Amino acid sequence: MRSLLCAPLLLLLLSAGESAVITGACDKDLQCGEGMCCAVSLWIRSIRICTPLGSSGEDCHPLSHKVPFDGQRKHHTCPCLPNLVCGQTSPGKHKCLPEFKNVF
């Protein structure tokens, strides 16, 4: 009899558990807004989320495809904003930097 009284309480506790809702989940760049790409999540590698394009001084990956990219990205960073390039700052380290054009 006591177990019958505990069953509804147990169900109430189970249904009140915490859960996560992932916003901005995507598969391809075209599902994200302007100035964003669909990059691999830092926390859950099997999920891609809409991520802002790299700003000046932010980390980048030199092999990131331009936006929009029709396939699935393999990195957690987006390419740099259009007026920036992904330049090497030290061995194995790249950052979004201003694009210097040759004036000659």
From Swiss-Prot:
Alphabetical UniProt keywords: Disulfide bond, G-protein coupled receptor impairing toxin, Secreted, Signal, Toxin
Intrachain S-S bonds: C26-C38, C32-C50, C37-C78, C60-C86, C80-C96
Annotated GO biological process: endothelial cell proliferation
Expressing tissues: Expressed by the venom gland.
UniProt keyword Signal present: yes
InterPro entries per record: Prokineticin, Prokineticin_domain
Pfam families xref list: Prokineticin
Signal peptide residues on this chain, from the entry's feature table: 1-19
GO CC term, one of those recorded: extracellular region
Keyword Disulfide bond attached: yes
Chief subcellular location: secreted
Subcellular location(s) per record: Secreted
UniProt GO MF annotations: toxin activity
Protein function: Potent agonist for both PKR1/PROKR1 and PKR2/PROKR2. Potently contracts gastrointestinal (GI) smooth muscle.
Entry similarity comment: Belongs to the AVIT (prokineticin) family.
Name of protein: AVIToxin-VAR2
